[in-house]
């Protein structure tokens, strides 16, 4: 799991189905509040299903992240730069904006990895 660094032993089935969840890196409610309400239905559908915005992660961590932005949730330090870069790439692709608190958090993270490229 990129968010926690844990190895998840996953076997398809009822008892393990919550062990891995697909996260929207930019939560859909965050996207809505930062510009998605102004894009077309087609673009919103693409945003919700774009592999750039989808990531298989630890289920409980995803539930804890919920619809939080980068000012409220960051993964483990080793993945933060990639995570923030991915969020920015999604927001750029779909013309979403960043709140001031989100920007502060993103800048703080990206200052630790100045060579981080957007995916």
Ranges and model annotations:
Residues 1-57, 62-66:
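Betabetaalpha-Me/HNH-type nuclease active-site subdomain
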Residues 64-119:
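C-terminal, well-folded lobe of enzymatic/effector domains
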């Amino acid at each position: 799991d990129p968010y926690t660094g844990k190895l998840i032993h996953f076997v398809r089935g009822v008892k393990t189905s919550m062990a891995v969840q697909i996260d929207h890196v930019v939560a859909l409610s965050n996207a809505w509040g930062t510009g998605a309400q102004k894009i077309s239905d087609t673009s919103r559908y693409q945003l919700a299903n774009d592999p750039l915005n989808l990531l298989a992660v630890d289920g409980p961590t995803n539930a804890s992240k919920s619809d939080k932005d980068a000012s409220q949730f960051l993964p483990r330090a080793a993945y933060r730069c990639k995570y923030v870069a991915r969020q920015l790439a999604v927001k750029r692709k779909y013309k979403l904006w960043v709140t001031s608190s989100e920007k502060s958090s993103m800048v703080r993270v990206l200052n630790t990895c100045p060579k981080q490229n957007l995916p």
